């Protein structure tokens, strides 16, 4: 069994990233960026087991651009030597996938399930698709607060499990999807992207929430000698074994 921890930045501030990622500093992590971040620039240099990849927004009214070419022009300013991608809201199309392949991208984690174990596969563009097993926001929306036992009973030993945690849910220890939705809707995007550590302290949920679940998941994995990888590490292993 392998656990892969991933995170979609989704335009939050560096203060929120710092709070959200503190429990993950000793673990492999794939972070999908929506823009430049001084915090991530420094953190990736300090944590060689972290990787950053682009998280482009191809949806309508995107701040990344109004067309596929405009979005790629925006994200190429911050993705560096990227090999993987995950699109905002998992938005995709044949044209988008083919453009990623033409630009040399090798893997995607752009398919989100609801606790369904789907083995990674090579798609028609030659990209390794590594589906998501658990996403915090989706689980909160449709099921409520995740409990460790509920997640574990959907797993089996010989599989890889990709988890997607958003910094907003970790920093605020979310226990209710609608609360975060109302928070986002209550302010301009510019204000949302500047929320401070003090804002996090005031808004943080003190009951059991997503951050608590992540802590239990990590403890369970460590006690049971479950392997942690980031997505790039997993891709490299699959590439080496590909016939």
Model-derived features: positions:
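Terminal accessory/targeting
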Residues: 1-50, 73, 77-81, 94-106, ...
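Histidine-centered catalytic micro-motifs
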Residues: 52-58
């Amino acid at each position: 069994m392998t656990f892969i921890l991933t995170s979609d930045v989704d335009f939050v501030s560096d203060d929120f990233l710092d709070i959200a990622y503190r429990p993950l500093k000793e673990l492999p992590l794939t972070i999908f960026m929506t823009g430049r971040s001084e915090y991530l620039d420094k953190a990736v240099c300090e944590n060689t087991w972290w990787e950053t990849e682009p998280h482009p927004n191809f949806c309508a009214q995107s701040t990344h651009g109004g067309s596929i070419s405009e979005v790629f022009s925006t994200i190429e300013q911050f993705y560096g030597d990227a090999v993987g991608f995950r699109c905002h809201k998992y938005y995709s199309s044949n044209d988008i996938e083919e453009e990623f392949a033409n630009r040399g991208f090798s893997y995607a984690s752009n398919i989100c399930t609801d606790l369904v174990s789907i083995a990674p596969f090579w798609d028609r563009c030659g990209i390794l698709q590594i589906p998501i097993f658990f996403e915090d926001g989706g689980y909160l929306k449709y099921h409520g607060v995740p409990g460790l036992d509920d997640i574990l009973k959907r797993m089996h030993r010989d599989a890889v499990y990709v988890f997607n945690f958003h910094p907003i849910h970790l920093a605020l220890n979310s226990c209710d999807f609608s609360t975060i939705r109302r928070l986002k809707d209550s302010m301009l995007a510019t204000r949302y992207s500047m929320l401070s550590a003090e804002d996090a302290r005031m808004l943080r949920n003190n009951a059991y929430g997503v951050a608590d679940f992540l802590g239990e998941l990590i403890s369970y994995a460590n006690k049971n000698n479950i392997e942690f990888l980031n997505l790039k590490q997993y891709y490299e292993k699959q590439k080496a074994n590909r016939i």
